[in-house]
Amino acid sequence: MEKILVTISTGAASFAVLAVLFTIPSLYNTINEVHDEVLDGVSVFRVETDSAWTEMMDIQITVTPPTKPRVNPFNSIFRQKRQTFSGLPAWCQCEPTKPTCPPGPPGPPGQPGQPGTPGAPGPKGEDNTSTYAPITCAPVSQDCVKCPQGPAGPEGPAGPAGPAGPDGQPGAPGNAGNPGSDGQPGAPGDDGQPGAPGQDGQPGAPGQDGQRGSGAPGAPGAPGNAGPAGPAGQDGAPGQDGQPGPAGPAGQDGAPGNAGSDGQPGAPGGPGLPGNDAAYCACPPRSAVFVSRH
C-alpha cells in the first residue's frame, strides 16, 4: 500500500515539473509581447500628444502673441531656497514647476468617524451618611377645584333702536328781528331824447390881421423809398492768400493689420537619452522653450 502511494506521489510531482517546464517559455514569450505592445502604445501616445500640443500652441500663438512670464519683484531681495534632486538621473536634474494657482474651495465634509473607545470606569462613589427628615405630604382635598375668574369677554353688538319718544311742549315766541340794512344803489336810468336845435347866433366881428411867423424850419421828413438797383460793377482783383490755419487734431488709429505668415519650422531636436527600467520620470511641463521651437 505504501509503495502505491509513493508511486502515485512521484508520478504527480514529475507531471507538475514537466508542466512547469513547458509553461515557463510560453509565459515568458507572452510577457515580452505585452511589454512590446505597451511600449508601442506609449510611443504612439507620445507622438499624438506632442502633435496635439504643437497644434494648440500654434493656434494660441496665432490668436494671442506670447507674453512675458511674470517675475516676482521680491526675487532680487530675498534669496530663493535651493532644492536638491540628487536622487534623480542626470537628465531629470530640473526644478519642478511651482504651483501658482490659488487654492480651490474647501471640499464637502467627510463621513462621520467611528465611535471612540469607551472611557475607563470612574471611581466608586462614597456612601451617603446624612439623614433626612421624613417628608409629610398634605392631605389630598376631595372638593372641586376653584378656578380664578377669567378676563372680561368682548363687547357685545349694539342693540336695536328704541321707540320714538312723545312730542315736546311748544316753545316760547321769539323776539322781533332787527331792521334790515340799506340796499345797494340802483343802476343809472336810460339816456333821454336829444333836445331841439337852437337858433343860429349873430355873425361875429372880423378879426385883426395876424403877425407873420419866423419860426425855425421843421425836422427833415422821413427818407423816401429805395430807388431801383443800379447796374452790376466790374469784378474786383483777387485777394491775397490767407495765412495757413492751425494743424487739425490727429486722426484715430487705423485697424490692426493682418497676421504675418508663419515662420520656417525649426530644426528637429536630438534624440533623448534612454530611461532606466521602472525609473521613468514624469515629463516636465511645456515651457517657453518648447513654444519658441514650434
Swiss-Prot record:
Entry annotated with the keyword Signal: yes
One GO CC term, this protein: collagen trimer
Sequence ranges of Low complexity compositional bias: 164-209, 219-265
Pfam families reported in the protein's UniProt record: Col_cuticle_N, Collagen
Biased composition (Pro residues): 100-112
Keyword Disulfide bond on entry: yes
Region annotation (Disordered) ranges: 100-134, 148-278
Signal peptide, first to last residue: 1-30
Single GO term (MF): structural constituent of cuticle
Region annotation Triple-helical region: where it falls in the sequence: 102-127, 153-274
Keyword field: Collagen, Cuticle, Disulfide bond, Repeat, Signal
PANTHER family named among the record's database cross-references: COLLAGEN, CUTICLE COLLAGEN 10-RELATED
Record's function text: Nematode cuticles are composed largely of collagen-like proteins. The cuticle functions both as an exoskeleton and as a barrier to protect the worm from its environment.
Subunit comment: Collagen polypeptide chains are complexed within the cuticle by disulfide bonds and other types of covalent cross-links.
The protein's name: Cuticle collagen 144
Organism expressing this protein natively: Caenorhabditis briggsae
Gene assigned in the entry: col-144
